[in-house]
UniProtKB/Swiss-Prot annotation:
Protein name: Nucleoside triphosphate/diphosphate phosphatase
A molecular function (GO) term: ribonucleoside triphosphate phosphatase activity
Organism annotation: Streptococcus pneumoniae serotype 2 (strain D39 / NCTC 7466)
Residues the record lists as binding Mg(2+) 1: N87, D103, D107
Physiological role: Has nucleoside phosphatase activity towards nucleoside triphosphates and nucleoside diphosphates.
Reactions performed catalytically: a ribonucleoside 5'-triphosphate + H2O = a ribonucleoside 5'-diphosphate + phosphate + H(+); a ribonucleoside 5'-diphosphate + H2O = a ribonucleoside 5'-phosphate + phosphate + H(+)
Positions contributing to Mg(2+) 2 binding: D105, D107, D120, E123
Length: 177
Protein backbone atom coordinates (compact mmCIF):
# COMPACT_ATOMS: atom_id res chain seq x y z
CA UNK A 1 0.00 0.00 0.00
CA UNK A 2 1.32 3.40 -1.00
CA UNK A 3 1.48 5.84 1.90
CA UNK A 4 -0.92 8.77 1.72
CA UNK A 5 0.67 12.15 1.11
CA UNK A 6 0.31 15.44 2.93
CA UNK A 7 -3.10 16.90 2.13
CA UNK A 8 -4.66 13.56 1.15
CA UNK A 9 -7.87 12.47 2.85
CA UNK A 10 -8.23 9.02 4.38
CA UNK A 11 -10.89 7.05 6.21
CA UNK A 12 -10.19 5.70 9.70
CA UNK A 13 -11.90 2.51 10.88
CA UNK A 14 -11.93 1.31 14.46
CA UNK A 15 -12.72 -2.35 15.13
CA UNK A 16 -13.31 -4.45 18.22
CA UNK A 17 -11.24 -7.54 19.08
CA UNK A 18 -13.95 -9.82 17.63
CA UNK A 19 -13.57 -8.13 14.22
CA UNK A 20 -16.76 -6.07 14.37
CA UNK A 21 -16.62 -2.52 13.03
CA UNK A 22 -16.81 -0.04 15.93
CA UNK A 23 -16.56 3.46 14.43
CA UNK A 24 -15.60 5.18 11.15
CA UNK A 25 -14.20 8.68 10.53
CA UNK A 26 -14.55 10.00 6.98
CA UNK A 27 -12.11 12.44 5.41
CA UNK A 28 -9.28 12.75 7.91
CA UNK A 29 -6.67 15.04 6.33
CA UNK A 30 -3.14 13.62 6.38
CA UNK A 31 -0.51 16.06 7.65
CA UNK A 32 2.52 13.74 7.75
CA UNK A 33 3.42 10.13 7.11
CA UNK A 34 6.56 8.26 8.04
CA UNK A 35 7.45 4.59 7.91
CA UNK A 36 5.86 4.10 11.35
CA UNK A 37 3.48 6.99 12.01
CA UNK A 38 0.64 9.00 10.53
CA UNK A 39 -0.39 12.43 11.76
CA UNK A 40 -3.71 13.81 10.59
CA UNK A 41 -6.48 16.21 11.46
CA UNK A 42 -10.22 15.87 11.90
CA UNK A 43 -12.25 19.05 11.64
CA UNK A 44 -16.01 18.77 11.27
CA UNK A 45 -15.41 15.17 10.25
CA UNK A 46 -18.32 12.78 9.80
CA UNK A 47 -18.22 9.92 12.33
CA UNK A 48 -20.41 6.83 11.95
CA UNK A 49 -21.00 4.54 14.93
CA UNK A 50 -21.49 0.77 14.64
CA UNK A 51 -25.23 1.19 15.22
CA UNK A 52 -25.51 3.61 12.29
CA UNK A 53 -25.72 6.81 14.35
CA UNK A 54 -23.80 9.68 12.78
CA UNK A 55 -22.29 12.82 14.21
CA UNK A 56 -19.75 15.46 13.21
CA UNK A 57 -16.64 16.40 15.21
CA UNK A 58 -16.98 19.87 16.73
CA UNK A 59 -13.44 21.20 16.81
CA UNK A 60 -10.14 20.57 15.04
CA UNK A 61 -8.27 17.57 16.44
CA UNK A 62 -4.76 16.40 15.61
CA UNK A 63 -4.67 12.59 15.43
CA UNK A 64 -1.56 10.45 15.92
CA UNK A 65 -1.22 6.77 15.00
CA UNK A 66 1.90 4.60 15.28
CA UNK A 67 2.84 1.10 14.11
CA UNK A 68 4.80 0.25 17.26
CA UNK A 69 2.65 1.67 20.06
CA UNK A 70 -0.60 0.22 21.38
CA UNK A 71 -2.38 3.55 21.60
CA UNK A 72 -3.49 6.42 19.42
CA UNK A 73 -3.83 10.04 20.46
CA UNK A 74 -6.39 12.72 19.66
CA UNK A 75 -5.45 16.30 20.60
CA UNK A 76 -8.66 18.35 20.59
CA UNK A 77 -7.98 22.04 20.07
CA UNK A 78 -10.49 24.11 22.01
CA UNK A 79 -10.83 27.79 22.85
CA UNK A 80 -9.76 27.13 26.46
CA UNK A 81 -6.78 24.92 25.56
CA UNK A 82 -5.99 21.45 24.28
CA UNK A 83 -7.56 18.34 25.73
CA UNK A 84 -6.60 14.80 24.78
CA UNK A 85 -8.37 11.51 24.27
CA UNK A 86 -6.10 8.50 24.02
CA UNK A 87 -7.36 5.09 22.94
CA UNK A 88 -5.57 1.96 24.01
CA UNK A 89 -5.56 0.21 20.66
CA UNK A 90 -3.56 -2.02 18.39
CA UNK A 91 -0.89 -0.46 16.21
CA UNK A 92 -2.54 0.73 13.01
CA UNK A 93 -2.76 -1.08 9.69
CA UNK A 94 -3.20 0.79 6.42
CA UNK A 95 -4.78 -0.62 3.27
CA UNK A 96 -6.52 0.83 0.20
CA UNK A 97 -9.77 1.17 2.15
CA UNK A 98 -8.70 2.86 5.39
CA UNK A 99 -6.34 3.22 8.33
CA UNK A 100 -7.52 0.46 10.68
CA UNK A 101 -6.95 -0.48 14.30
CA UNK A 102 -8.52 -2.50 17.09
CA UNK A 103 -9.95 -0.46 19.96
CA UNK A 104 -9.31 -2.08 23.35
CA UNK A 105 -11.77 -0.03 25.40
CA UNK A 106 -9.35 1.55 27.88
CA UNK A 107 -8.98 5.27 27.32
CA UNK A 108 -6.98 8.03 28.94
CA UNK A 109 -8.48 11.52 28.93
CA UNK A 110 -6.44 14.62 29.71
CA UNK A 111 -8.44 17.75 30.43
CA UNK A 112 -7.29 21.28 29.56
CA UNK A 113 -6.26 21.80 33.21
CA UNK A 114 -3.94 18.75 33.03
CA UNK A 115 -6.15 16.36 35.02
CA UNK A 116 -5.77 12.77 33.77
CA UNK A 117 -8.44 10.08 33.95
CA UNK A 118 -8.33 6.38 33.02
CA UNK A 119 -11.73 5.58 31.51
CA UNK A 120 -13.78 2.48 30.68
CA UNK A 121 -11.94 0.04 32.96
CA UNK A 122 -15.16 -1.94 33.53
CA UNK A 123 -15.83 -2.13 29.79
CA UNK A 124 -12.27 -3.38 29.26
CA UNK A 125 -12.68 -6.12 31.88
CA UNK A 126 -16.06 -7.13 30.45
CA UNK A 127 -14.75 -7.31 26.87
CA UNK A 128 -11.59 -9.07 28.05
CA UNK A 129 -13.78 -11.93 29.31
CA UNK A 130 -16.33 -11.84 26.49
CA UNK A 131 -13.79 -11.62 23.64
CA UNK A 132 -11.09 -13.73 25.32
CA UNK A 133 -8.22 -11.24 25.39
CA UNK A 134 -5.09 -13.28 26.03
CA UNK A 135 -2.85 -12.74 29.05
CA UNK A 136 -0.13 -11.55 26.65
CA UNK A 137 -2.48 -8.95 25.15
CA UNK A 138 -3.56 -7.81 28.61
CA UNK A 139 0.11 -7.39 29.59
CA UNK A 140 0.96 -5.46 26.40
CA UNK A 141 -1.96 -3.06 26.87
CA UNK A 142 -1.15 -2.41 30.53
CA UNK A 143 2.53 -1.79 29.69
CA UNK A 144 1.52 0.65 26.96
CA UNK A 145 -0.71 2.53 29.41
CA UNK A 146 2.53 3.11 31.37
CA UNK A 147 4.34 4.28 28.22
CA UNK A 148 1.46 6.61 27.38
CA UNK A 149 1.41 8.10 30.89
CA UNK A 150 5.18 8.67 30.63
CA UNK A 151 4.64 10.54 27.34
CA UNK A 152 1.91 12.64 28.99
CA UNK A 153 3.96 13.44 32.10
CA UNK A 154 7.00 14.41 30.02
CA UNK A 155 5.20 16.40 27.32
CA UNK A 156 6.44 14.03 24.64
CA UNK A 157 5.22 14.11 21.03
CA UNK A 158 1.53 15.03 20.77
CA UNK A 159 1.58 16.14 24.43
CA UNK A 160 3.90 19.03 23.60
CA UNK A 161 2.25 22.40 23.03
CA UNK A 162 4.75 23.06 20.22
CA UNK A 163 3.71 19.82 18.47
CA UNK A 164 0.03 20.78 18.52
CA UNK A 165 0.81 24.32 17.32
CA UNK A 166 3.04 23.14 14.46
CA UNK A 167 0.53 20.62 13.13
CA UNK A 168 -2.48 22.89 13.56
CA UNK A 169 -0.65 25.67 11.70
CA UNK A 170 0.21 23.22 8.90
CA UNK A 171 -3.44 22.14 8.71
CA UNK A 172 -4.61 25.76 8.36
CA UNK A 173 -2.05 26.32 5.56
CA UNK A 174 -3.22 23.22 3.68
CA UNK A 175 -6.91 24.00 4.21
CA UNK A 176 -6.50 27.48 2.78
CA UNK A 177 -4.64 26.39 -0.35
Amino acid sequence: MKLPKEGDFITIQSYKHDGSLHRTWRDTMVLKTTENAIIGVNDHTLVTESDGRRWVTREPAIVYFHKKYWFNIIAMIRDNGTSYYCNMASPYYLDEEALKYIDYDLDVKIFTDGEKRLLDVEEYERHKRKMNYSDDLDYILKEHVKILVDWINNGRGPFSEAYVNIWYKRYVELKNR
